[in-house]
């Protein structure tokens, strides 16, 4: 394979990857109208969201999971505006004015997408997991197994993460932010 052919193959891969990634992000946002006009508007919405999430240090898993409830609220209550309502999703942001501006753009996108609100929430909850394995969760399970020969935490995590999209009301604590001490956990490729 020549260098030009390799560059061409890499370019094709990048275009395919970007297309699928963008499609997945639209689904995570509950936007299923894939017309070219909607896709272009959704691209602007997604890019501004990614910047907003990064600037505000928002936990992506928590954001995307809570977004389905926010979308339902935006679609079912015409009087609702994020600026007037303290919502759990809004509370994730330090810059609430920026979130409010994004939320207004998001509502416009939802209004152009014909999917019924409750069905949208169900579809979003099936693509946005509530639970992911976080370093601190693995650390607790490892420490219990090593120091106490107690494998119950591993079993519990295995069961929980086997169905990460389900609510698991008795396991809500695993869906929250990591504890402060977890910032000190260091993971390497040889761990």
Where are these regions (language model features)?
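Regulatory N- and C-terminal appendages and interdomain linkers associated
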Residues: 1-191
């Amino acid at each position: 394979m020549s260098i030009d052919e390799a560059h061409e193959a890499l370019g094709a891969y990048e275009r395919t990857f970007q297309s699928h990634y963008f499609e997945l992000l639209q689904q995570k946002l509950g936007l299923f109208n894939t017309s070219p006009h909607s896709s272009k508007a959704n691209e602007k919405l997604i890019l501004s969201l990614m910047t907003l999430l990064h600037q505000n240090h928002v936990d992506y898993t928590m954001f995307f999971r809570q977004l389905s409830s926010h979308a339902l609220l935006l679609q079912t209550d015409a009087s609702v505006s994020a600026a007037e309502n303290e919502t759990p999703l809004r509370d994730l942001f330090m810059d609430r004015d920026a979130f409010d501006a994004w939320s207004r753009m998001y509502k416009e996108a939802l209004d152009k997408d014909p999917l019924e609100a409750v069905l949208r929430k169900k579809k979003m909850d099936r693509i946005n997991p509530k639970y992911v394995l976080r370093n601190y969760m693995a650390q607790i399970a490892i420490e219990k197994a090593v120091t106490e020969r107690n494998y119950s935490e591993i079993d519990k995590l295995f069961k929980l993460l086997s169905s990460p999209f389900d609510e698991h009301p008795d396991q809500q604590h695993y869906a929250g932010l990591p504890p402060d001490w977890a910032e000190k956990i260091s993971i390497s490729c040889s761990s």
